[in-house]
């Protein structure tokens, strides 16, 4: 049976479903067919997801769009019932590049508008990935242009730190509705989450499973899927450890972005609304924090506006 996530209201009055399907292919093997993205999107909509997250840099917007189109054609959903997020890449940060970049994404997605457009990183790069010195405040002007043109219903950012969020809010007439950042048990981001929420900016959480899902990194900090704290919660609520971690984020007021191409797991990852963790259980998971990221962006550490 399909399970639909509740929605919350953003600071611009629009609403957003509180679970999104992630479509980034960072852990995909070269042998994996990109068509699995189209199939995953279709299965997700079939399972009740109404929020799909993608990005220009994922190079799968066409497949995301195909999955959406197929679901609409088969009567599973209407466009208006869906919430689609995509992101501006680092080499399109000049104000006059933003709207054309979004138009290119819309063309690939087969959509007339995007529900949420994000600046993927505060870092600007040239096409060869060398550093550029474009201020993200200029980029935000282009994002505001996109919203005024009706191409993006809502606009926000991703991977911004607290100082950058404060500076952006102080120098813009449209406040970002979202900061999408990595949040999981080993990277709980409590100060940044609290800062965003205090400004009325919602937080989307990517890499929600952290290192609990084996990623093959040596020296990665705990917990793992057999951790006693997590397995006790899974047994108590009759859920998987993955579902416990997603519910942990929801109970912190966050919007998790689980990623899967497995039909059963896609459905499992939204089956989160018949239980709730206690304050003490959320606090116990917070204790795993090591400020250790799954997604390593340190290659850009010497670039202007690196969000350390």
From Swiss-Prot:
Its EC number(s): 1.1.1.-
InterPro entries xref list: AKR, AKR2E, Aldo/ket_reductase_CS, NADP_OxRdtase_dom, NADP_OxRdtase_dom_sf
Enzyme class, broadest EC rank: oxidoreductase
PROSITE patterns cross-referenced by the UniProt entry: ALDOKETO_REDUCTASE_1, ALDOKETO_REDUCTASE_2, ALDOKETO_REDUCTASE_3
Tissue specificity field: Detected in hemolymph (at protein level). Detected in larval ovary.
Keywords: Lipid metabolism, NADP, Oxidoreductase, Steroid metabolism
Designated name of the protein: Aldo-keto reductase AKR2E4
């Amino acid at each position: 049976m399909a399970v639909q996530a509740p929605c919350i209201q953003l600071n611009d009055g629009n609403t957003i479903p509180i679970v999104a399907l992630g479509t980034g292919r960072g852990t995909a093997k070269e042998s994996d067919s990109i068509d699995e993205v189209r199939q995953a999107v279709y299965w997700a909509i079939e399972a009740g997801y109404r929020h799909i997250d993608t990005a220009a840099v994922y190079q799968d917007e066409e497949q995301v769009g195909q999955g959406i189109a197929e679901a609409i054609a088969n009567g599973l959903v209407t466009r208006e019932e869906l919430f689609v997020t995509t992101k501006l890449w680092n080499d399109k940060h000049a104000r006059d590049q933003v709207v054309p970049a979004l138009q290119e994404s819309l063309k690939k997605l087969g959509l007339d508008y995007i529900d949420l457009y994000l600046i993927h990183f505060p870092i600007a790069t040239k096409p060869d990935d060398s550093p550029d010195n474009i201020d993200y405040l200029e980029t935000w002007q282009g994002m505001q242009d996109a919203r005024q043109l009706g191409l993006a219903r809502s606009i926000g950012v991703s991977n911004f730190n607290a100082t950058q969020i404060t500076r952006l809010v102080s120098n813009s007439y449209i406040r970002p509705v979202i900061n999408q950042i990595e949040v999981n048990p080993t990277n709980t981001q409590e100060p940044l989450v609290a800062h965003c929420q205090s400004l009325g900016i919602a937080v989307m959480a990517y890499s929600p499973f952290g290192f609990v899902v084996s990623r093959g990194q040596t020296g990665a900090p705990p917990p793992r899927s057999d951790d006693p704290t997590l397995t006790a919660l899974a047994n108590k609520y009759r859920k998987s450890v993955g579902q416990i971690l997603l519910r942990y984020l929801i109970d912190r007021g966050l919007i998790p972005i689980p990623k899967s191409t497995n039909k059963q797991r896609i459905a499992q990852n939204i089956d989160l609304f018949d239980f709730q963790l206690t304050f003490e259980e959320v606090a116990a998971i917070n204790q795993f924090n090591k400020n250790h990221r799954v997604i390593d962006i340190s290659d850009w550490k010497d670039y202007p506006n690196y969000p350390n």
